[in-house]
């Protein structure tokens, strides 16, 4: 399989973690390398609905939209519940994890200087309301969101909490259950190895970059 996405810690991260957890081989490719173009806008027209990530399963089959890809992989990694009601609840929680993308992923992955400070200030303000329903689930069901078993929604929630913990851990000081959740999640098969080998993240708030094979590349939607 081939996973196509930007140089960015966002929608593709939970997908990568699921594939590592399920021991599913894949190749991660930037869109400009996969499509042979200089920037994302040059290849956007060739992508279903013009969005990434996409998962190339074989020469004839491509999936798009992160939620669809996650649900497809959940059936291969035993991270989708069998009970239909619980399955619907897991779907709903996964959909709500997308509320973290702009305040967390974009703030630390793309914003710089004054804009970064403004976005971080806003994140600090809205975070309690964003986290509360997830935290309630951890208190009711822990160590994961619905039980002692991780479902695919846990992978998405972990991604955002891990990024927040690494970039502004003080914002989670009042949420010990999230620390417990992250520590338990990192014990899942394949997760620790993935975290040790994924690109390192530097320059937060100034010049964000991700390290690939010793070379640090700016985050974003273009070749640099």
List each model region and its residues.
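Alpha-helical packing segments of well-folded alpha/beta enzyme cores
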Residues: 15, 126-130, 134, 160, ...
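Residue-level recognition of oxygen-bearing side chains
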Residues: 68, 177, 190
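Surface-exposed helix-capping loop/turn segments at secondary-structure junctions
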Residues: 79, 136-148, 189-195
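Acidic/histidine-enriched, glycine/proline-rich intrinsically disordered or flexible terminal extensions
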Residues: 198-224
């Amino acid at each position: 399989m081939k996973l196509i996405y930007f140089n960015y810690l966002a929608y593709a991260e939970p997908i990568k973690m699921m594939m590592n957890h399920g021991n599913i081989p894949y190749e991660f490719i930037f869109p400009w390398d996969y499509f042979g173009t200089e920037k994302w806008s040059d290849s956007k027209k060739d992508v279903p609905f013009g969005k990434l990530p996409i998962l190339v399963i074989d020469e004839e089959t491509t999936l798009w939209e992160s939620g669809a890809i996650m649900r497809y992989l959940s059936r291969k990694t035993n991270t989708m519940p069998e009970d239909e009601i619980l399955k619907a609840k897991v779907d709903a929680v996964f959909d709500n994890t997308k509320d973290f993308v702009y305040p967390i992923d974009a703030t630390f992955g793309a914003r710089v200087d004054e804009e970064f400070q403004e976005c971080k200030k806003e994140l600090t303000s809205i975070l309690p309301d964003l986290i509360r329903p997830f935290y309630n689930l951890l208190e009711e069901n822990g160590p994961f969101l619905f039980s002692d078993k991780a479902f695919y929604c846990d992978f998405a929630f972990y991604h955002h909490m891990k990024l927040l913990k690494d970039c502004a851990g003080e914002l989670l000081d009042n949420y010990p259950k999230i620390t417990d959740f992250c520590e338990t999640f990192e014990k899942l098969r394949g997760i620790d190895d993935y975290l040790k080998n994924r690109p390192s993240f530097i320059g937060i708030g100034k010049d964000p970059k991700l390290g690939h094979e010793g070379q640090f590349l700016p985050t974003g939607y273009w070749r640099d």
